[in-house]
Amino acid sequence: MSTNLCPNASSSDIQPILYSYWRSSCSWRVRIAMNLKEIPYDIKPISLIKSGGEQHCNEYREVNPMEQVPALQIDGHTLIESVAIMHYLEETRPQRPLLPQDVHKRAKVREIVEIICSGIQPLQNLIVLIHVGEEKKKEWAQHWITRGFRAVEKALSTSAGKYCVGDEISMADCCLVPQVFNARRFHVDLRPYPIILRIDRELESNPAFRAAHPSNQPDCPPELPNK
């Protein structure tokens, strides 16, 4: 995809580049946040599968030493880690805020984000599942997603309105929807989590969320059902 780079352009004139993998929930969070804030960006696909994983090549290691996605080149800087990226976007592009003004609601958003991004997703991430092994990876992922979703559902029982925290979309929603997708991939029984399911259904038709969906990414395999 075009990056619109111009040698005479200032860093603020260069369109951001998001290094992304179509099914990466971490990349997905950032895509949602950028779409919600209406920030134009180009995607540079990084396959986590092809040739043993393009994230491990020397060229990409210079972009992200953690050899993971996402990475975002923006304002003359390269940022890694999805939550750090979302906070940067929130601080530099305050339009369509993803954190509430109320300090208690803001803390609740961060709580839900941490449960998902620290307590669930890293434990069912590709790099972990490779070490767990093919025979046990489904059971492993189900265990950690179920454990984490119990905590998320409990948090939502006191914080949710239309969305995770009240009636405005927040970073918590940006993180929840991709994690529900992961749960379905690993055939987690989601019936015990009615609030999670309701919020996921509410957001599935939102244009920013729909555009960020894996099936709408340039590197999504053409044979994927419902692409």
Swiss-Prot record:
One of its GO terms (cellular component) is mitochondrion. Residues 102-222 form the GST C-terminal domain. Pfam families: GST_C_2, GST_N_2. Glutathione binds at S24, S25, C26, S27, W28, R29, Q55, V69, E81, S82, Q121, N125, L126, I127. One of its GO terms (molecular function) is glutathione transferase activity. It comes from the Eukaryota. It is found in: Cytoplasm. Coiled coil: none annotated. InterPro entries: Glutathione-S-Trfase_C-like, Glutathione-S-Trfase_C_sf, Glutathione_S-Trfase, Glutathione_S-Trfase_N, GST_Zeta, GST_Zeta_C, GST_Zeta_N, Thioredoxin-like_sf. PANTHER family: MALEYLACETOACETATE ISOMERASE (PTHR42673:SF4). Belongs to the GST superfamily. Zeta family. This is Probable maleylacetoacetate isomerase 2. It comes from Drosophila melanogaster. The lineage of its organism: Eukaryota, Metazoa, Ecdysozoa, Arthropoda, Hexapoda.
